Amino acid sequence: MPQGGLGSRSREKLAAVLRDTQGTISPSQAARALKLSKSRAAQLLAFWASRGWLSRVQRGLYVPIRLESKTSEGPLEDPWVVATALFSPCYIGGWSAAEHWGLTEQIFRSVLVITTKKPRRRKRVLKGTSFILRSVGSKAMFGLKPIWRGRMRVQVTDPARTVIDMLS
């Protein structure tokens, strides 16, 4: 993927988009930040991705690339932020929450996401990160604790709910 610099106007636009978003960027968010049409914002996001400033996670969703990164094809910096953007309303639970709360010493390669949506595929792999999806009714959205990951609030099961979920 060719990487390159940006002109001053493009750099200002990218900075405005990054300031107004919370870890993930969609064309509608970019359009709002830049006061452009959604299609023009999508073109800009694709351009910035082609230049190595953003990484495309899936159609319509991008993440910023860290300045010290040598490539835009690396793993997701924060899979929980991407999960929240893709599957909301959702929460992080099971082994992923247990790892977060220090209830296990194991490090898991996949993220368990519980959502009220009905996903077509129960397992999604994005940028090398595996997301395991489980559907629940909206009444099961309790025992959650909001945590901050960067500038985004992510719902995760509290320690008691994590243990209960893992035992059931």
Q: At which residue positions do the language-model features occur?
A:
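Short beta-edge/loop segments at beta->alpha junctions of small alpha/beta modules
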Residues: 2-89
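Residue-identity detector for glycine
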Residues: 4-7, 23, 52, 60, ...
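Catalytic-loop motifs flanking and including active-site residues across diverse enzymes
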Residues: 90-93, 159
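Phosphate-handling catalytic interfaces
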Residues: 100-168
